[in-house]
Amino acid sequence: MAENLYRARSRVYSPSVLFLHPDMGIGGAERLVLDAALALQEYGCDVKIWTAHYDPNHCFIETRELSVQCAGDWLPRSLGWGGRGAAICSYVRMVFLALYVLFLSGEEFDVVVCDQVSACIPVFKLARRRKRVLFYCHFPDLLLTQRNSALKKFYRAPIDWIEEYTTGMADRILVNSQYTASVFKETFKTLSHRNPDVLYPSLNIGSFDLAIPEKIDDLVPKGKQFLFLSINRYERKKNLPLALRSLVQLRNRLPSQEWDKVHLFMAGGYDDRIPENVEHYKELKKMVQESDLERHVTFLRSFSDRQKISLLHGCLCVLYTPSNEHFGIVPLEAMYMQCPVIAVNNGGPLESIVHKVTGFLCEPDPVHFSEAMEKFIHKPSLKATMGLAGKARVAEKFSADAFADQLYQYVTKLV
């Protein structure tokens, strides 16, 4: 990073950059926005973040190093009825936020970086002093929802059109993986002439290097030796039941004396304002009870960074269960902490994990996952060898320096 600071001082001019993000909570998208903002700030840019929701008690601690402003949190997140209408409410919140920033905030900036919701882009493009816009597409939003009824299809049609049209208004489009780039091209037919650039998320290595793992004795039940860890938000699309079903299959593969030493930590982002988080947590708890896994599973909701680092240090491996994941920052965190990863063999993990070197890429079924889990129990040296390979891969391919330099080049070319 010292080299970055030297380069920043040597520049005559660095642009002013404003980030626009729907909700600065705790998730992969928020981690990327935060890392991007910190990287540009270190390169000498004047950086500000504006968001529709920010809770200092439910966010990454590094947000305190940045100027984070909030507007529009009074607007509804959904139309009620179990979270229905969340998409249109998100669009309204982001358009309001863009209008507020442009006309009421007094902010001066050269480039806008926005992500997740593209509906705000026209506000900046149609302003009297048009702003240059960089849009980071984590994944086409229209693919993240079900259309199980004619009413839902009718509701989504204009939203999907707005997403595609406004995404095309960005001056530059970035995606998080080659996989997402291919899906982008297949999904947005009218944008076939646009070729998004791939900017892999980076890992904030400094925070991991400085952290001292704590003892996890208070978290680990007595007698447990073979510890596994699942890290993901409490959302159904993350396929968390796969981890529990894999645990059931593992029980069938092990003698009772070994099974008694097995424990799984189900950890991840949880927000009681989000109905799906609350509902899915209850579903998983019920599944644990019905599968007779109470003595083998511990749920951790919105656990701290220190707890995460300590668990990654103490567990045999991470179970990463989402299918067709856009990229996934969790495998990078695990590999850098020398904790191998068992992941589904599609989507982003194909670009981050090397099969049988830094972890295992498996079919998304409990049998294959449990087979990989058993390997770590019966061959303890696997964690050490795969862990070293994983850390080396993250340092080589997903370094913060490479991410920062590439992002800075994209931003400065817009000015």
From Swiss-Prot:
What CDD domains would the database entry show? GT4_ALG2-like (cd03805)
Any GO BP annotation: protein N-linked glycosylation
Domain of life, per UniProt, equals: Eukaryota
**Cellular location(s):** Endoplasmic reticulum membrane
Q: Which UniProt keywords apply?
A: Endoplasmic reticulum, Glycosyltransferase, Membrane, Transferase, Transmembrane, Transmembrane helix
Annotated EC: 2.4.1.132, 2.4.1.257
Recorded catalytic activity of this chain's protein: a beta-D-Man-(1->4)-beta-D-GlcNAc-(1->4)-alpha-D-GlcNAc-diphospho-di-trans,poly-cis-dolichol + GDP-alpha-D-mannose = an alpha-D-Man-(1->3)-beta-D-Man-(1->4)-beta-D-GlcNAc-(1->4)-alpha-D-GlcNAc-diphospho-di-trans,poly-cis-dolichol + GDP + H(+); an alpha-D-Man-(1->3)-beta-D-Man-(1->4)-beta-D-GlcNAc-(1->4)-alpha-D-GlcNAc-diphospho-di-trans,poly-cis-dolichol + GDP-alpha-D-mannose = an alpha-D-Man-(1->3)-[alpha-D-Man-(1->6)]-beta-D-Man-(1->4)-beta-D-GlcNAc-(1->4)-alpha-D-GlcNAc-diphospho-di-trans,poly-cis-dolichol + GDP + H(+); a beta-D-Man-(1->4)-beta-D-GlcNAc-(1->4)-alpha-D-GlcNAc-diphospho-di-trans,poly-cis-dolichol + GDP-alpha-D-mannose = an alpha-D-Man-(1->6)-beta-D-Man-(1->4)-beta-D-GlcNAc-(1->4)-alpha-D-GlcNAc-diphospho-di-trans,poly-cis-dolichol + GDP + H(+); an alpha-D-Man-(1->6)-beta-D-Man-(1->4)-beta-D-GlcNAc-(1->4)-alpha-D-GlcNAc-diphospho-di-trans,poly-cis-dolichol + GDP-alpha-D-mannose = an alpha-D-Man-(1->3)-[alpha-D-Man-(1->6)]-beta-D-Man-(1->4)-beta-D-GlcNAc-(1->4)-alpha-D-GlcNAc-diphospho-di-trans,poly-cis-dolichol + GDP + H(+)
Q: Would you identify the family this protein belongs to, as annotated?
A: Belongs to the glycosyltransferase group 1 family. Glycosyltransferase 4 subfamily.
Q: What does this protein do?
A: Mannosyltransferase that operates in the biosynthetic pathway of dolichol-linked oligosaccharides, the glycan precursors employed in protein asparagine (N)-glycosylation. The assembly of dolichol-linked oligosaccharides begins on the cytosolic side of the endoplasmic reticulum membrane and finishes in its lumen. The sequential addition of sugars to dolichol pyrophosphate produces dolichol-linked oligosaccharides containing fourteen sugars, including two GlcNAcs, nine mannoses and three glucoses.
Kindly provide the name given to this protein in its UniProt entry: Alpha-1,3/1,6-mannosyltransferase ALG2
Native source species: Mus musculus
Gene encoding this chain?
Alg2
